[in-house]
Amino acid sequence: MSLVAAENTATVQNLRTAFEGESNAHAKYTAFAIKADQEEFHGAASLFRAAARAEQIHSTNHARVIRMLGGHAEAEIHPVEVKSTLENLKAALGGEQYEIDSMYPDFLEEATAGKNTAAIRTFTGALEAEKTHARLYGEAIALLVGGKKDAWIFAARDFYVCPVCGYTSDTEEEHERCPVCNCPWEKFEIIR
């Protein structure tokens, strides 16, 4: 480990933890999307695919900072337990809430104390995206539980993912630029 990494040991460990978590979330949400399509919840599948792409962006950003600090980014991808789409949405929401309420705030506090602007930036981008994922998962759960047959969870739909920070939106008209990193809206990836 380089001197730079040694000086930021706690932040590097937090980055590794976040990298592994986001890498596993990508794998999990990809598997959940397949199950949602099988159950004909194509809108929920679109949401899982968009969230999976965002998590992939987060893991890439975390890995970049780890390498910048002289560390190595390696993730152990765990087997995914796939259940019903409703159960998968609830599991995804639980994971997002943990990241919002605990993990990323703690990691941001440590990075801020160490004045590590690159870590602050990658953690902030991930945290803000997780907030939109949690909102969207909550909406999907409510629609599934409510049993509305015309709800968006049944038909494939577009979601918009910032290629820089992973911010995710469910509407094209929301922004001219990413509200988190200022990336131009026209660069957003459309995920269906």
Indicate residue ranges for each PLM-predicted region:
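Non-heme di-metal
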Residues: 1-192
